[in-house]
């Protein structure tokens, strides 16, 4: 079924705790993940919490990538939402799995904006005139 976008909701477990608490490294790896997925980066913002933890977003022309880390638990919650045919959120997922050194992951893929639910014809172009 065609959809406007794909949304990966990922749980990363047993990650490197030092990586999870390094805001500069997290931002660098999230941007690299966006690049590897084929996305176009618009902007990003990241914040390190005290005493630990990082939250951040990479806004891409095709939607967004977000991360929230809990270094004390070795855990990261990651959303990779991409639109369009040219961006592959699974490439971003694989990059981040390696970068965060996750030993276990759980991921669910959601189709966002399914054509049949919205009433878009299957042969319709991805972007329609407004």
Curated annotation (Swiss-Prot):
Transmembrane segments: none annotated. Pathway: Amine and polyamine biosynthesis; S-adenosylmethioninamine biosynthesis; S-adenosylmethioninamine from S-adenosyl-L-methionine: step 1/1. The record marks 62-63 as: Cleavage (non-hydrolytic). Pfam families: AdoMet_dc. One of its GO terms (cellular component) is cytosol. Its EC number is 4.1.1.50. The active site is at residues 63, 68, 83. Belongs to the prokaryotic AdoMetDC family. Type 1 subfamily. Heterotetramer of two alpha and two beta chains arranged as a dimer of alpha/beta heterodimers. This is S-adenosylmethionine decarboxylase proenzyme. It comes from Thermotoga maritima (strain ATCC 43589 / DSM 3109 / JCM 10099 / NBRC 100826 / MSB8). The lineage of its organism: Bacteria, Thermotogati, Thermotogota, Thermotogae, Thermotogales.
């Amino acid at each position: 079924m065609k959809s406007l976008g794909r949304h990966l909701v990922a749980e990363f477990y047993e990650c490197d705790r030092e990586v999870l608490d390094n805001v500069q490294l997290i931002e660098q790896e999230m941007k690299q993940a966006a690049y590897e997925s084929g996305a176009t980066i618009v902007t990003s913002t990241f914040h390190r919490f005290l005493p630990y933890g990082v939250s951040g977003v990479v806004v891409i022309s095709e939607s967004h990538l977000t991360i929230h880390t809990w270094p004390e638990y070795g855990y990261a919650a990651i959303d990779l939402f991409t639109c369009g045919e040219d961006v592959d959120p699974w490439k971003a997922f694989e990059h981040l799995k390696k970068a965060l050194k996750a030993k276990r992951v759980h991921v669910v893929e959601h189709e966002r904006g399914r054509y049949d639910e919205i009433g878009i014809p299957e042969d319709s172009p991805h972007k329609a005139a407004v």
